[in-house]
């Protein structure tokens, strides 16, 4: 496993904030599927956290669905939340808090629903993150999240493996590892399933550039420093 540099994660997404909404098609699809999971549930939450809220689209929809709830958008990158503030409007505002998913500035048992779309894969210690969620959740509350899985970006990973041994992507977890982390953290009755979302790009280099523009670039703490040369890029695409 390649350790994750959380400071690098915050920097990458902060730089991507202004253009994030133009490029985040996969994130939108995953968010809509996650929101659909809420539809059949008869929830009446008083406080909702959107962890890894980005530019706030999930928080806005949660506020629309639960207008009486306090919705708190949490993200590690301040520029993302600044974009959320510009876009949220005045009619159904939500709070914005810069915080780590594994160190929430909230009291114990103070949250009814945690919503988190494609965030937990950026957490260095998933068990610690889930334990923190369990701390702030009230008894019987719900955490609903999505994550990239073990098979995500495998073709790009294989392309880089032909170039060198340095980590160019963070390692994603198998669904069983995610479930085990939830159980070990003390979360009750975890239910996980797997969906396949496909995104086609002309070549590996195009995909790599899109990931970087999204803020989803290399955040492995053991990544190679410095620029990638033209020869390495050509070999990666071969």
Describe every region a protein language model picked out:
Residues 47-104:
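Class I SAM-dependent methyltransferase SAM/SAH-binding core
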């Amino acid at each position: 496993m390649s350790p994750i540099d959380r400071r690098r994660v915050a920097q990458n997404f902060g730089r991507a904030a202004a253009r994030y909404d133009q490029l985040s098609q996969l994130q939108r699809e995953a968010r809509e599927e996650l929101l659909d999971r809420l539809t059949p549930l008869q929830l009446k939450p008083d406080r909702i956290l959107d962890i890894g809220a980005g530019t706030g689209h999930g928080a806005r929809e949660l506020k629309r669905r639960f207008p009486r709830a306090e919705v708190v958008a949490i993200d590690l990158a301040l520029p993302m939340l600044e974009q959320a503030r510009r876009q949220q409007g005045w009619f159904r505002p939500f709070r914005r808090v810069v915080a780590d998913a594994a160190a929430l500035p909230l009291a114990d048992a103070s949250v009814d629903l945690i919503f988190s779309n494609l965030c937990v894969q950026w957490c260095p210690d998933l068990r610690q993150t889930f334990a923190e969620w369990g701390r702030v959740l009230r008894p019987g509350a719900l955490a609903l999240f999505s994550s990239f899985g073990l098979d995500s970006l495998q073709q790009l990973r294989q392309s880089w493996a032909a170039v060198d041994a340095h980590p160019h992507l963070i390692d994603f977890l198998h669904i069983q590892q995610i479930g085990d982390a939830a159980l070990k953290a003390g979360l009750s009755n975890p239910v996980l399933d797997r969906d396949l979302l496909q995104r086609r790009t002309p070549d590996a280099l195009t995909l790599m550039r899109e990931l970087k523009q999204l803020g989803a670039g290399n955040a492995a703490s053991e990544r190679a420093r410095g620029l990638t040369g033209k020869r390495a890029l050509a070999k990666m695409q071969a």
